Amino acid sequence: MSEEFELDTDDLKRRMDGAMANLKTEFASLRTGRASASMLEPVMVDAYGSMTPINQVGTVNVPEPRMVTINVWDKGLVGKVEKAIRESGLGINPQLNGTIIMLPIPELNEERRRELTKVAGQYAEHARVSIRNVRRDGMDQIKKAKADGMSEDDQKFWETEVQELTDKMIKAVDAALETKQAEIMQV
C-alpha cells in the first residue's frame, strides 16, 4: 500500500481560474455598442520609443453610454494616440478637441451583433476546453495514484472532487457567456 495520496486541487482550481480570467479578458475586447474603458486595453501607442497602453499616456473616461474620452497628458502624443485608435480595427473614428480625443461609439447593426455573439461563444468554448484539459490532468494523476496502490474509495473521492470543480467552472463559463451575449444583443 502506498502512502496517502493528496491531489493538489488548489493547483487545478488555479489553472481553471486562469482559463476563466482569460475568457473575461477576451470578452472585454468584444465591442458591445456600449462605451467602456476596457475596449481600449488592447490598443498600444508608440510613445517615447516603446509601445505603451493608452491608459499610460492619458486618462480614459466614459462620460456617456456611447462616448469614451481620452485626455492625453502630452500634447505631442495626441496624433499618435489618434493614429493607434484608427488602426486598431475597433471601427471607431476619433474626434480631436485639443488634448482630448473623443470616441463616439457607433450603434451595432443586427448582423454585427449576431457575429459578436458567435465570437463570444467561440471564446467560451475555448475556455471550456481549457478547463476540461485541466480536469483530464487531474484524472490522470488519480489514475497514476490508483496504479500505485490507491484504494477504490479514495479514487472515487478524488474523481468526484475534480468533477465537481470542473462542473462549477463550466457553469461559471456558461453564466459569463449568457451575460455577455445579452449585453451584445441589447440595443
From Swiss-Prot:
<comment type="function">
    <text>Responsible for the release of ribosomes from messenger RNA at the termination of protein biosynthesis. May increase the efficiency of translation by recycling ribosomes from one round of translation to another.</text>
</comment>
<keyword id="KW-0963">Cytoplasm</keyword>
<dbReference type="GO" id="GO:0005829">
    <property type="term" value="C:cytosol"/>
</dbReference>
<dbReference type="InterPro" id="IPR023584">
    <property type="entry name" value="Ribosome_recyc_fac_dom"/>
</dbReference>
<protein>
    <recommendedName>
        <fullName>Ribosome-recycling factor</fullName>
    </recommendedName>
</protein>
<dbReference type="Pfam" id="PF01765">
    <property type="entry name" value="RRF"/>
</dbReference>
<comment type="similarity">
    <text>Belongs to the RRF family.</text>
</comment>
<dbReference type="GO" id="GO:0002184">
    <property type="term" value="P:cytoplasmic translational termination"/>
</dbReference>
<dbReference type="InterPro" id="IPR036191">
    <property type="entry name" value="RRF_sf"/>
</dbReference>
<keyword id="KW-0648">Protein biosynthesis</keyword>
<dbReference type="InterPro" id="IPR002661">
    <property type="entry name" value="Ribosome_recyc_fac"/>
</dbReference>
<dbReference type="GO" id="GO:0043023">
    <property type="term" value="F:ribosomal large subunit binding"/>
</dbReference>
